[in-house]
Amino acid sequence: MEQAIIAGGCFWCTEAVFRDVIGVSEVESGYIGGSVADPTYKQVCTGSTGHAEGIRVTYDPDVISISEIYDVFLGTHDPTQLNRQGNDIGTQYRSAIFPLNAAQGEEAKAAIERWNKDNGKVAVTTIEGLTGDAQTAPWYPAEDYHQEYWDGEGQRNPYCLAVIPPKIMKLRKSFQKYVKS
């Protein structure tokens, strides 16, 4: 099993999408890319910590590649929006990839270039924290109530009901071969 860390707006949304992707065994919501150790959701929401709301995906590379993970990521949120996704505004909602090694860094660059070419637009997705062959930004798991949010509280949350189903539909329409049956 391997891992990937990505940030594409509210982690509830990104987590919900990747829970439906083949080869993915675990999705953990959390914070990465900031300057405060062990940040809380309340702190991150102020935008002052520098963290992004992200997800750490554990996946089987024999089922889905890192390249395909990045393609699904870029294709299920709007990577052209700087420091926001829809009504969620702030650096904590930026579109970013946090490669865990140099190979993932190269795949991230290639995925962004592919997305730009295929869509005729320019993604503002950043590649962050990679120094040499290591990710230097610490990962901090989000509070327990954020984990598997869509599967529980999210089904009753008006924000989630408005934002998550269109992302899941985009996954099912544009990335059908990567959807769990």
Specify the residue positions occupied by each region the protein language model found.
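Flexible coil/turn and secondary-structure edge motifs
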Residues: 1-181
